[in-house]
């Protein structure tokens, strides 16, 4: 059975999501985040990375409707293509822990979690690991205004 490699991300202490192995390009352990006035609660900050200002999305805040409580904040930098053949673009996600790599097989596919709601807006698929569903994030949708 074919397998793929994914990064499992802790969005907060309870929420997990995943991205493809090649989508995460950098992890910033103690990010300097700059506040953006009058921005939505799930995207209140930006991260300067490689001389580029990236939105720092808090997907846990978007899903739960309030900012996530984290013991530590990390920022993952992710690459995505807005459309096929386009140059890669980058965005940041706020994380609650260091991502872990995992192997995923087709027979692990499952339905998206029912709670919190709105996973269908963020995710393109889902797999089960240790009896927990882990949604696979749709990064182009997330970073190109799909959450507005």
Give the location of each predicted region.
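An acidic, low-aromatic, low-complexity terminal/linker signal
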Residues: 1-148
């Amino acid at each position: 059975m074919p397998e793929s490699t994914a990064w499992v991300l802790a969005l907060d202490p309870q929420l997990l999501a995943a991205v493809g192995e090649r989508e995460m390009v950098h992890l910033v352990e103690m990010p300097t985040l700059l506040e953006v006035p009058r921005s939505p609660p799930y995207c209140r900050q930006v991260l300067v990375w490689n001389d580029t200002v990236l939105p720092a999305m808090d997907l846990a805040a978007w899903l739960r409707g309030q900012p996530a409580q984290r013991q530590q904040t990390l920022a993952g930098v992710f690459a995505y293509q807005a459309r096929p053949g386009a140059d890669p673009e980058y965005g940041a996600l706020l994380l609650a822990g260091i991502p872990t790599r995992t192997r995923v097989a087709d027979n692990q596919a499952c339905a998206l979690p029912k709670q919190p709601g709105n996973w269908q807006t963020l995710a393109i698929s889902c797999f089960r690991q240790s009896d927990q569903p882990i949604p696979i994030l749709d990064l182009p949708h997330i970073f190109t205004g799909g959450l507005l």
